[in-house]
């Protein structure tokens, strides 16, 4: 599986795509009372270097939550996690059985970080990998660690990331969903997260998959 993930990571690095992040603060009735919305294109520069470009105006009308550097690192690295041969050694994995997801026969694995040092971010949760080609098709868990100090708290929601095949070969993230209540000292705060990864195009080619 890690070998397949390394192939997936290398292939995804050859694609441009659009990343749309929406985070809603919800009141105790489930109504939105604050929102963060941002669209980024992950593209190549004229020098063929990978870069990001914000599209349009970023809306930040959050009232109680504040997005931190760790949140943006998680959006970039944890929610669309790829468990390559270079990163898998950071994790303990345990077999949890098998399950059919959307008609796909999968192995189910528990994945937890072996050790967390200062400043590191990891995934803690479950993954579903198809039995046929070992592609990861689903992740459920959260980014860790939570960060608590006397003066501040930085808590992170549970999420589910779904992958779909792009160009009929490798499975790339297409959306991340999270709906969780974070237990701050000042009181619980429910939030709803949605990240869409769309318009995948191989550099110099046309896209064959655009999620809706």
Predicted features and spans:
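Structured extracytoplasmic
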Residues: 1-123, 131-137, 142-157, 165-175, ...
């Amino acid at each position: 599986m890690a070998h397949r993930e390394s192939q997936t990571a290398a292939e995804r690095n050859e694609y441009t795509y659009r990343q749309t992040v929406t985070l809603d603060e919800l009141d105790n009735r489930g109504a939105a009372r604050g929102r963060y919305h941002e669209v980024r294109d992950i593209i190549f520069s004229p020098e063929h270097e990978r870069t990001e470009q914000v599209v349009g105006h970023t809306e930040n009308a959050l009232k109680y939550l504040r997005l931190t550097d760790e949140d943006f690192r998680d959006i970039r690295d944890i929610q669309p996690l790829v468990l390559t041969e270079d990163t898998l050694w950071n994790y303990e994995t345990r077999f949890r059985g098998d399950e059919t997801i959307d008609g796909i026969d999968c192995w189910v694995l528990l994945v937890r970080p072996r050790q967390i040092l200062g400043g590191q971010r990891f995934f803690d949760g479950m993954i579903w990998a198809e039995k046929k080609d070992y592609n990861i098709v689903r992740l459920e868990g959260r980014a860790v660690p939570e960060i608590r100090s006397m003066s501040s708290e930085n808590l992170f929601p549970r999420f589910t990331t779904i992958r779909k095949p792009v160009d009929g070969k490798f499975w790339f993230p297409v959306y991340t969903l999270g709906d969780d209540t974070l237990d701050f000292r000042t009181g619980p705060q429910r939030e709803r997260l949605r990240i869409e990864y769309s318009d995948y195009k191989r550099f110099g080619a046309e896209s064959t998959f655009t999620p809706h």
